[in-house]
Amino acid sequence: MNDTIAAVSTASGPGAIGIIRMSGPGALSISSSFLFSKNGFLSPSDIQPRIAIQCVFQIGDRKIDQILFFYFKTPNSYTGEDLCEFHFHGNPILLREALDAIFRAGARPAKQGEFSRRAFLNGKLDLTGVEAIGRLISARSRFELELAQKNVFGEVSRLTSNLRSQLISLKAECEAEIDFSTEDLTYESLEERKVRIEGVKTFCQTVIAKSNSAEKVIQQLRIVLYGEPNTGKSSLMNVLLGKDRSIISEIPGTTRDYISEEILLEGIPVRLVDTAGVRETEDHIERLGIERSEKEFQSADIRLFLIDVSKKEEWKKFIAKAKGRLEGSILVANKIDIRDSSWNPNLFSDVKDLIICEISCKTKEGIPILLDEIQKKAATMGHVEDYVLLEERQRYHFETIVRCLDKTLRLIEEGAPAEIYIQEMNYALSEIGEVNGRVDTEEVLGRIFSKFCIGK
């Protein structure tokens, strides 16, 4: 890394500010050849680290723009090298002209993710930190963003540090028993050792499970609208989306397959699913749609169970059949504006964890309350404190650690000497190192940094 790289680090297109970033041993000297103040061009000795300098970016005799310039001296910079930033007005033509001049002065174009690669290679970031930055940039929801922020500030590094500490303690106990076997010392029993190893394994499995749950939320929770025909599922779908997506008709069986759309609720991505109305039918196509409705209902993260409270016999008959399936759902009593006098929400007081919302899709009565209840349910599934976000590569290494610990336990059960099962602990420790980026090949680095933009 003896060369100097440069790139635009702000988004393409016009903007209030456009930033060119340059890193490497020649960054300061190249920069000074373009920085013009009232006393002439600045020399490197005129430029103090971490102090904003207002000056003119000038190419030869031609003034290009009034800019702010920042210099970060090695090693106290993002990349660990001398790093300079030019803050221009954000015109793409202007930035291109300035960047071309910087290239002519001796810098070369940065490759994808090269600034972060240099930060990693110079020890400014471990690999989990680099991956966290990539996730931070690409996050599609507030939930994903907050999980990425946790990792930027060292969540995965803390977990691996904790795990490493537990494993080293275990390994040290085993090695002490080997090295001082002739001494009159007391060591933990094999049963106690197995309990400790199981504890470390459980720690890993918990991290993996929390990550899998986080990915499920990131990939979208599914909110399924379920009920008999003409209870208002399609109308509610359109109301929640704020647009006409589902066809509405008085004819039963209009929706024959599920329809889905993505929305954001409190920063959490969810997918609304409008299903076919559930009823007895001889129509083969409609029956297939009803079967899909059942599958969607079973796999839903949040269930909206719709009933039409304007028709006494209809909703009472349906609830008699379906009351046992309401636990944990939101019962949406639709058409409350024309409800039958027999409607009584207290009929469901014995159903566990059931929320009842009375609404009218026609008048919009109760819709804000329903939305609030949906958001509350979604939020309970999206508390960032309850989750860990592992990248696919990191998850693989955690799963490998679990396999190493499983083999360690099996070897102990089989009566293998400590010298043998300690080797599995060494493999597990090696996997922890891989999580944080103690890697020997360029392949992993290339795969990670290929997802970054040029100026990062």
From Swiss-Prot:
Its EC number is 3.6.-.-. Keywords: Cytoplasm, GTP-binding, Hydrolase, Magnesium, Metal-binding, Nucleotide-binding, Potassium, tRNA processing. GTP binds at residues 230-235, 249-255, 274-277. The keyword Cytoplasm applies. One of its GO terms (molecular function) is metal ion binding. K(+) binds at residues 230, 249, 251, 254. The keyword GTP-binding applies. Residues 220-379 form the TrmE-type G domain. GO terms for cellular component: cytosol. (6S)-5-formyl-5,6,7,8-tetrahydrofolate binds at residues 21, 85, 124, 456. NCBIfam families: mnmE_trmE_thdF, small_GTP. Exhibits a very high intrinsic GTPase hydrolysis rate. Involved in the addition of a carboxymethylaminomethyl (cmnm) group at the wobble position (U34) of certain tRNAs, forming tRNA-cmnm(5)s(2)U34. Homodimer. Heterotetramer of two MnmE and two MnmG subunits. Belongs to the TRAFAC class TrmE-Era-EngA-EngB-Septin-like GTPase superfamily. TrmE GTPase family. This is tRNA modification GTPase MnmE. The lineage of its organism: Bacteria, Pseudomonadati, Spirochaetota, Spirochaetia, Leptospirales. The gene is mnmE.
